[in-house]
Amino acid sequence: MRKLIAGAFAAALMGTAAGATGLKIEIEGEANGTVMIDLLEEVAPQHVAQITELAAAGAYDGVVFHRVIDGFMAQTGDVQFGKEGGDLGRAGMGGSDMPDVPAEFSDVPYDKGVVGMARSQNPNSANSQFFIMFDAGHFLNGQYTVVGRVTEGQDVVDAIKRGTGGNGAVVGTPDLMRKVTVTE
């Protein structure tokens, strides 16, 4: 009985920690519009809790899409070096003041519209950066944590300004997340 009560209490805490079912992202630039993301709290509870906390604090507002590879994905979320108006030369190298989150790999496939957490070569290094898939990328399956899916606005995602070269670095003025709101 104690385990049942403790489990219910932990589940209730986890639900209030994340406190969200999605994100509303208002994108500006070559792409203009709103993207709705359904967060998969049951798949990646720690990652969802971290990104919703960052979103609720306004950390993602004004952050650019710094790495965008045609036919693959658009990456954003560098709240340290990726803010509009800053020196974007280091965009993609930073994170938040929060600790990195351990990997929460799942069997959810990387299909078009799936949202995953960016990380370094260390699987336990995801922090604030995430990416949205333009197309399927099943070679990522089980290698990167899935946190959500686009439910509305994939056409807006598909219009995000593309980067150049093999690394997809965006030259000039990148598109950005003007406002990111946690939805219930």
What are these regions (language model features)?
Residues 2-7, 15-184:
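Cyclophilin-like peptidyl-prolyl cis-trans isomerases
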